[in-house]
């Protein structure tokens, strides 16, 4: 009720369209909105509401569900390869009291394929108070989380639907996010916004009823995100904690960080422009009392140190306000974990952390140098005449070249399996491309009659799977489900490959008479992270050393033992270089820029990797160049591929010496105070999220939808447009003008056939029937 009907000031408005009037939809769209709340009612209501919320916050963590005594997280590993998990959990348990008092910053650098997912959960479980249990968010370094990825995580940890929430999808686009913020600002009703992006889905079957959550929102997705003991999501789902400027989008992720710990999976996979936002998230995690774990085999020193400094700055604020000893100096419990050894040390400042981290990395590098070599790579030269070719012809020639490299790799005995039933030789390989745009043309070119030389016709059968991030989410999830099954090579022996006994693969081998079968995934960079796949070999169009190392982790991932020869071919450069030779080639993805000192003088890997590989024809691909600085600590970012990455990270994440200018996009602006006696406290303002945009995308985009026709037999493309009323959507048919199906004749190759056979209409029908 209005406290004073005659109060002259109003706080907000509401749209005419909300009136219960059958004629409201016919009213002029430009008509003035109705005044809603008087200012006195609004302010007194906010005060009462905020008081109740603030009084409930201290007990929130103790009241929410937690994971207690989960046996799979305590079970000792029977496999010697995963014994490091037991040692890591034991070490974490031994320092849990220190971590509870002073915070914890954990670095897990175990090699790809060593079971970091389960290891991370076991470490965080060991750190948690046994009396209250584990509450933790696992944030993946992906833009979009498919249900298939979430279910794999759930199965790895043996969690029920009452113990884990899976936030499927990606965060809203920047344009859509800003549009609704502007709409809320225009009406003064920002507090009425939904707390989560409407496009996402949170799958959780547990108890999400808590008085505070009921008061904050009636959004079941927000309840689940906050209440679930364990949450698996993308970093995009948590960054609104620091990136939202209006409304309530920050509330749910803030409360998630306030009531649990944080694991960042593959944090070094982010674009350089997104590292400031990642730094802000880690700073806030420290400020709200979370313990943080970074998990990646390719963590560069500057990134680890920069995120530690951000966490320390946040933790110092937390300690001043919520610690039992607020005047005590900050001393964070730090842990370093990998498959070789584990270490812990209290670090009061950046210098102590840097020294301890450097010492640990040196030990790791020494172990990597002694380890068995499972991935051997060589550089493949590219034709000089590509510079003068038309782009379409160059892409066709690229398709022929990578198929030739794939055939050469397949022929090595260590890169294929022999089917005992038929004597056919079978391999599963990956051709990684740097960008999606040329991938479509390259895939079509592989179906051309001349894609394989005449002498291989009738001898070689290519089974081609195209896989990238721009598929409709349901279709991408279906492809991933099949790849996850087929590329699980656990239990493989010299005379036994589990892949050959999968019914889907078996049927394809038996239905084609050729003696050689190459199952090829032609994929974008999405193939590098988040997928537990084991390939026999890989052909790589390069982007960065980081991506090369991550991709190498998908080759012989499940099969220990030294490889008998080369199983990776890295092209000497990429297609972007031949399209624009004077422009940066290793960007988007990559670390090169147009500005010195971060523009490379050469785009040929035989120049950029000369120091690393010397005169060797083949070299071992592992994490050494990414995790360690050069022995002389001198970086030449314009001449060396790995130095470029280290220099970019150092420039963005670490504070500059006093007296030098700090770049506008420096990640350290969130926490670094050049003059502590006069702090700027930029993190208390909304300036940085405006000038250092997360997932900045200036390209204009349209929303489109595939809708079934009247007979529900065909999907037709429509453009999604805003209607007259708020939230109204119009679907404008554009199928005839913008959708160009590939003629069946263009895919009728004598040697190449599509694999797997996945149809969106069939997947939709199956999903509808299942629900």
PLM region spans:
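Walker A/P-loop NTP-binding motif
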Residues: 115-134, 151-154, 281-284, 311
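Conserved interdomain linker/interface between the two RecA-like ATPase lobes of SF2 helicase motors
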Residues: 294, 304-308, 313-439
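Conserved C-terminal RecA-like helicase domain
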Residues: 83-98, 102, 111-114, 128-130, ...
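N-terminal accessory nucleic-acid engagement/regulatory domains that precede
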Residues: 1-75, 156
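SF2 helicase catalytic motif II
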Residues: 236-239, 250-288
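Conserved SF2 helicase motif VI
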Residues: 545-568
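The feature captures the C-terminal accessory region of ATP-dependent helicases
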Residues: 390-424, 428, 434-457, 461, ...
